[in-house]
């Protein structure tokens, strides 16, 4: 017989937005959640948020994710291609993930995880989870259209960056069974301090940011807590500012910590 006095803890999901280099801010958020023993029962990630989410779901400690991210360069995630569908292939990202993930199958992950991509033809989100190859799914979620070639899945779909349709994957976290969703949106401030991008890659990144900001507001409704690091002054391509981004993530998470703890306490059922 079940103990009638036992209190049931709500299932907590984490939704990590895309944002290229800005995703380093997720690491600061994770550091605060870990320090305050906030439980994470499932994780959904889009684009660069899927990279961080996959590592965390595979059991890689936050400190280790920070260490390996310090050495990450654009050449680690893409290489030039002769394809007419893109300037580069992001197949190297798949190789990088296989090097750092202790588990590469969804069904083996210690924490349930979903990577969100976009179906290029249908214009709809594709939630990759449950079974299958994690590095492939994350690669698809990160395939910035126009720069990286689309990633074809076994169903014949052409998959591209999930930020086009679900940059804040709170709905995917609900799909994984979350009762409470903590979302981290690293693009909430947009690029209010930035001028015109100086490279073609920068133009594509900033164009995607415009699109994601438009749709992100609609996706917030699926989240209970929205953490918004103040990083509007940092471009998506500035990998060298990872320490600053992590610090901003920490500050934003601390700002929301009391609300998170209050929500967890009130949602716990007798």
Give names to the regions the model predicted.
Residues 1-46, 54-270:
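Patatin-like phospholipase
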